[in-house]
Amino acid sequence: MSEMQPRPNDTLTRHMLYPFGNASFQAKSPPMLIEGGQGVYVTDASGKRYIDGQAALWNVNVGHGREEIKQAIRDQLDRLSYYSLFGGTTTAPPVELAAMLCRMAGPEGMVRAFFSSGGSEANEAAFKLARQYWRHAGEPQRHKVISLKRAYHGVTLGALSANGTQAYREHFEPLLAGFIQVETPHAYRNPFTTDPEALGRLCAELLEREILYQGPKSVAAFIAEPVQGAGGVIVPPANYWPLVREICDRHGVLLISDEVVTGFGRLGSMFGCRHWGVKPDIMVFAKGINSGYVPLGATLMNARVADAFLTPDEAEFTMAAFWHGNTYAGHPLACAAALANLRIVEDEALDRNAAEVGAYLLARLKDVQTRHPHIGDVRGLGLMIGIELVRDPETKEVFDLKRGFGARIADLCRARGVLIRNLADTFIVSPPLILERQHADTMVDAFEAAVAIVERE
């Protein structure tokens, strides 16, 4: 630890309970205080600069300190800081943003947007849309939601119930009834096959089998991330998503694409589902929608879903309305930031940059893997990459987590000016989409040096 910058004092933890944080650990090892950011870099309290290899939390896609976004927020703040979307009022930014989102997701058939304050809330809205859609469609018994094992959809109770990782769930059980998980197509860790096409087909068949077991007339929706994020960057086989769309169509099940991480270019295509050529019924966004400058989430729907809410009942207060909303839904500052952010994404073709630089970064990391046997797998798409350490590359046996190899490597990378996030012994590489090859080289060199040190220890 001698290579690390001095940690801030305990004032950073005395009154703060951090997300997913162990208060006892953080009392001894307070978090690093980030005080500045520009482009792909952030700066700590000592003035040391780091490549932000995690885009904060998968979300600062256009980079830190973008003047276009700051100016958009200032301009909107001068006009109107906040007003609600309730009670027959609205503001211009969410109206303009809804139109822009529906244009961008036009190839997927999206026609309406509903706003919230982040990804968990946006997924809650998706579940409520799905359930109320089926009530309007005359099938109120369709209430179940199927998701994948290892999935992450958020921390609110509905989103948590759709999560497929037990660690997120166990403290809060019993969770909501009607949420079911099926096997995820994890090429590196599955009990079935090493053939990607066979795996995609088998996992799709397991989904269909579960729909049939539950009773198709009881299933409202299937939700999945195009590439699983917090589950370890799990890239499905190419045939999986098209097969899922066919199965959902066959049984009338709504398909929800959770694009909170993958949306707006991270995978090298504007949306994750677009990479697979699949058109969902509902799409969920947050994070990259405005690169985290102001909290925002959005839930988009196609005409099938949206038209169900155009009922003959034209009363202002009616059970036909969508009975859901948040105080800060469509916040004008957040939406103004999103409009500026998405113009940058389109004008600078950041989806294409993610594809090109991401392929280069992935190839370099795979080359590192050939020299370090404890790197069991390197996987990813675009600028969304996972690196998994194993004790035994043949059996894929994991290290004892108490030894903290992943955290040690992340700390050594930090000492070399690179921030990457470790989830136990899997590393998440998800930098801003403006990353250049020179930044990728610095990241890879720091990571390999850190791995080499830990191997010798």
Where are these regions (language model features)?
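Conserved N-terminal phosphate-binding loop of PLP-dependent enzymes in the Aspartate aminotransferase
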Residues: 2-457
